[in-house]
Regions:
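A short, hydrophobic C-terminal helix/tail in secreted or cell-surface proteins
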Residues: 354-373
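A short beta-strand-loop element at or near the start of a globular domain
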Residues: 37-94, 302
């Protein structure tokens, strides 16, 4: 089980300042069974003497065991472990072409082998085990159970898939990935007595038992729920607004607050704010929000402020666009991107008219006064 930890500092994370947070993945396990697979490898030697066939490797066929892949529409894959628990059997038969009579008609054989089950670069391998057998005289011509020796083991274990290979196990929607099985380092030796024409060693390696239900393959997927950035703590709200109303020019800074929540819980991915863009870049508007990496865990809220400095008369508008991505460990598969939009507006007025406005007002007052005087003197206006 992975824990994705970070230190939450500052006063932004509501109720969690100065604490260590961790996103805890959810684990889902896929299981399957398969029929047994068998491979047969035959080595031979002509004439008296010893032959050793070292380090040969034969792949079992068919080799593929399908199992459900991780569906990236359900979350972010952050880890995986493969497990296997199956019986494996090595059977070795000695046989040969020998004369129908005479002495020294013996074939001695031996074989050492191991088996491997692999998934996405991770593998579990059995310990090597060996068997020996021989045939004598006419029994070499028609092999029987008396010329065959078997040894059984259990191939069992679990191992983690490298983060670099997680993408091999994931895809959008249902699908399958495959376990592979193989035989490794089959070291075989044949020793022929002097009256042997050709000696043979038949190595039979079986992965799994006759009962498919006992041949168990599984993969555990560790994943995080997607993050959910929102302007609300109760539901996903991706657009919001701040309205400063009408402010007096040079009347001093005005401040409004807003918050961003990562709706979720300890099983949710954190959020990284990768960039901030603005529609107008109006210099009268500023905010204390800045980009961050893994700065908002699931279920937490960050508080921010927007400041309006009314320096110029007229309407002020800007749209702040916040671009987020899921935060997850390197190699994770399925992270998403998100966007929040904050519309900010306000208006600035000046109660003292501009000089040009004063001129028109004075001209207007003068005209009104002149008309009034003419009327008082009995002259038409």
């Amino acid at each position: 089980m992975y824990k994705i930890a970070k230190f939450v500092s500052g006063m932004a994370a509501v109720g969690m300042a100065g604490s260590v947070m961790a996103a805890t993945p959810i684990t889902i396990t896929q299981n399957t069974t398969a029929s047994q697979f068998t491979t047969i490898q035959t080595q031979s030697r002509n004439g008296v003497g010893t032959s050793t066939f070292a380090g040969t490797s034969t792949v079992v066929g068919p080799t593929l065991v399908p199992i459900s892949r991780f569906d990236t529409t359900t979350g972010i894959l952050v880890g995986a472990r493969m497990s296997v628990n199956i019986p494996i059997t090595l059977a070795l038969t000695a046989r040969g072409n020998v004369p129908t009579s005479g002495n020294n008609r013996r074939v001695n054989v031996g074989s050492t082998v191991s088996g491997t089950v692999a998934l996405a670069g991770a593998s579990v391998t059995s310990t090597s085990f060996a068997v020996t057998e021989r045939c004598d005289n006419d029994a070499c011509l028609v092999p029987t159970a008396g010329n065959t020796t078997s040894s059984a083991r259990t191939l069992s274990g679990s191992t983690a898939v490298s983060a670099a290979n997680l993408a091999l196990l994931a895809g959008a929607g249902p699908g399958t990935v495959n376990f592979t099985t193989s035989v490794n380092a089959t070291n075989t030796q044949i020793v022929n007595r002097s009256n042997v024409i050709t000696g043979f060693a038949d190595t039979r390696f079986t992965v799994g038992g006759t009962t498919a239900a006992n041949n168990q393959y599984s993969v555990a997927y560790d994943y995080l729920n997607f993050a959910s950035p929102s302007f609300s703590t109760g539901s996903t709200v991706t657009s919001s607004s701040l309205n400063f109303g009408t402010l007096l020019i040079n009347g001093g800074l005005a401040t409004l607050n807003f918050s961003i929540t990562n709706i979720g819980n300890i099983n949710s991915a954190g959020l990284s704010l990768t960039s901030i863009s603005r529609s107008t870049n109006n210099s009268q508007l500023t905010s204390n929000i800045t980009t961050f990496s893994n700065g908002l865990d699931g279920g937490l809220t960050n508080n921010y402020s927007m400041t309006f400095d009314p320096l110029a008369v007229g309407a002020v508008n800007d749209i702040f666009t916040f671009n987020f991505i899921d935060f997850a460990p390197a190699g994770s598969v399925g992270a998403r991107s998100y966007q929040l939009n904050l519309a900010v507006s306000g208006n600035v007025f000046d109660p003292v008219p501009e000089p040009a406005s004063w001129m028109f007002m004075l001209l207007g007052f003068g005209l009104v006064g002149a008309v009034a005087r003419r009327r008082a003197a009995g002259q038409p206006g």
